[in-house]
Structure formats: C-alpha cells, structure tokens
Amino acid sequence: FSASAGFSGNSSFASDAASSAATVGAATGAGSGTPVTATVSITPDSVWPYPDNAIASTHPDRKEQNFRLYPKNTLIKGPVKTGKFHQAIMTAVGIIEGKDSNMMNIEPVPDVLEHYQQYVDEGRILHISYPDINSDGYDGFIERKRGPFIENGIFKQFANKCADGRYVVMMEEVDLNWMHLFRETAVLLRENRREGTSSETAITLPFSKEKFRLPSNLYIVATCDSIVCEDTILGAIDHDFFIRPVSPEPEILHGMRVEGISLQRLMTTINMRLSYFLGADYQLGEGFFLQSPDKDSFISLCRVFREQLVPLLEKWFDGDIERIRYVLGDNGKSRPDTIFFQEIPFRDGLFKGELPDSFDKERRIYRCNEDAFYNPKSYIDIYD
C-alpha cells in the first residue's frame, strides 16, 4: 500500500491556497490535486522513511497528560467538498505546534500547508489515504505473519517510534468499516487507556506476542463523508472519538459571479432541494464552486456540473432523472435550450396495439442536453 507523503488540496479552500500552489504544489501535488506518495514496503528489512532520531520508545513525552487543546482522536465528518481535509490539516498542525483552533484560523493558508508538509517530511505526521490501506487491512496496519517473519504495519511502526513532542496520524476519507484496521487494538484508542494514564492498557498482539501500547503524545485525525458515517456507527465510537461536524458554507461564495451566475444562490438552492429529497447529509460543499481558475471560470463551472455534479446526483438518486430535474429546476424552465434533461415523447404508434394495464403507461425517458451545460441561463434558471 502507499502512505501519502503529501496531500491533495481540498477545493473548499482552493481560492485561499492558490497563491501557495507554486511553492507547495511541486512538493505535495496539491496544485494538481494529485497526492505525492512514498511507497512503504512492509518487510522485515524495510527502511522506515522517517528519521532514526524519532526512535525513543521510553521517552517521557509518550506519557504526556498536560496537553489539552485537542482530543486524542478526532473524526471530522460532513458532506462532500465542505473543507473536511482543510480542517484536518489545521487540526494536525495545531496539535504539533500547540496552537488552538482560534489561532490556527488566523494563520495564512500557505503557511499552514508549508508547515504540514514539513511535519510529514520530519515524520511527525503520518498521512494515510484510507482507500489505499483498506485493502491490506489489519495486516498492513498493525502486523502480519509471513512465513517465519512478523512484519510490522504502518500504524504500529509509527506508534512505536513516537518520541519527543506530539505526533499525528491523518486518516483521509474513512468509511463505515474503518475500525476493522485496529481490531483488538481499538481499545487502546481511548484517552484513559494511553501510556501514562491511570488505566494504561497493553494488548498482546496475536502474531508477534508483543505487548503493544499507544503513547499519549499520538493523536488521530480522520475525515469521513457524512453519507457513509451513519448515526449508529458514530454512536459506537463516540466514546473514543470527538466527532466534529462540518457543514456547507455558501456565504463563502457571497458576491462571486460567473457570467452573471450567483454562485451563492446556485449552491443554496440546490442544497435546499437536495435536503428536501434526501436529507441534510446530501448537500454540496462550497468546494464544488471554488474549483474554477479566474481564467475560463465559466467553462470550468460547466465541466464541474457535467463531469462531477451530474454523476453524483445520478448516484444519490439511483438514476431517477425525474427527481434530478426537480433539483436542477428543469421542471419549471420555459426555454428548452436551458433544460439539462429533456423529456423525449413517445411517438404515436410506437407499439402495435394497446399496452396491458400492468405496464407503466406513465413512463418517461430523458436525454441529456449537452448544450445546456454551456448556457449561463441554464444555471441562472435553477434559482431565479
């Protein structure tokens, strides 16, 4: 699997971070949206990619109990593209630098990104993309037995090498099954089970038979889509994780217009309709509307709608185009050239004879009007 040594920029703060893309993007891939990865091969002779001076299993900081600005474990949940990853970066940097959230919120975004990458390089932050590690499961995360060898997983290695200061494991885009990575070690996540606490707990690992503990200076920050994290699952981990909700912020788009389109009104209207049909978790974050560079911004908006938004709506509505048309306002548009999904009428005589009563005689079919995506009026008519 790959442990990310960089990060892909979250669109919700793309406008703030644009000026830093040239300096940070080259090292991290943030400018292109593509993570830079360092492949860690888990073998008995593997080379740990972080400095040797991080090895200090008996360092007193591992038992630190006085730092209270952040909980040991944080799960940031919210709808798609609401800035969860940005919040996770701010949290991780704040933990290491000892700055609370208010102080982090006034830090210039380029500085935060630069510090984040610095701490990844120094081995203070372990950035894990959950989809990458999920396929390897517990074996790649904690440990596995391969023949006569015991191979340490990425999380176990990182936890064992926490030394002075504070360390953060960043887990991006976890899903309902993510706790299976921890298995029996999940009990160690709880704050009062960490090293140096009155209820310090050690687990005997199944393959190595080693006593495994989690240091108190190790913090976990995870992000998840609110759609995949059901309340029942969150309730099962709320004793171990502080759950921080993140909501869409259309006010960020205040005053922003593209070809006469009010991005704030567009986002607000679509989200209200989505909430009506599907619930509050099914909303669009401001990141959808901040992906456009200043030049060619309308074309970028068109492509976001056609290539990202429409497929997402089709997934959420299980292909029910009629309800998607209501979300996009197609049902009330007067001009055919602004309708994204146009109804195709059945011609007379399509079938020979009358259809049986058991057939759906009210069925409708639609075609996607590609030209509508490149017409500013199509978007204005969604909310106007």
Where are these regions (language model features)?
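C-terminal regulatory/interaction module of P-loop NTP-utilizing enzymes
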Residues: 1-7, 11-384
